[in-house]
């Protein structure tokens, strides 16, 4: 069914969100249906996973996600079970995530790039030079969150075109050519015109 996703710009703040995450990729399969972010297409989660927010604080120069050390693992705030009810054994993976918070001039709220809604568009300078894409005149590397995946607008396309897409306009009111398709067989197809992602499949 055709739909439209209105794009909005997000930019990093000087704040980070710290979370505790436990997950296990072996053993019984987790078949819960999840919507990983606002506007996302629901999907089946294949493994047991739970994450809880711990704090929001100012950025530090040495911020980085990491496996929890022995002292951190004793914290009582770690999730004890997956939302499906599966109880984590004591030896599962424990990760401390430290993610930058983003905000938008067009929309209220703050998000990390882990949970930013569909329609969010941002500059990803850390991707420049990693895939051979041609730099754009505004020196931005645009990424757009769609209902299915993160579209690297300024990256190469999966069909082998290293130049990727062409775009005009000022973010988030950009027009991109050609269209975007996702999946094999195709799960999504659409056009980005003047800051609106017009999805014609599904």
Predicted regions and their residues:
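A short Gly-Trp-Pro
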Residues: 1-141, 149-202
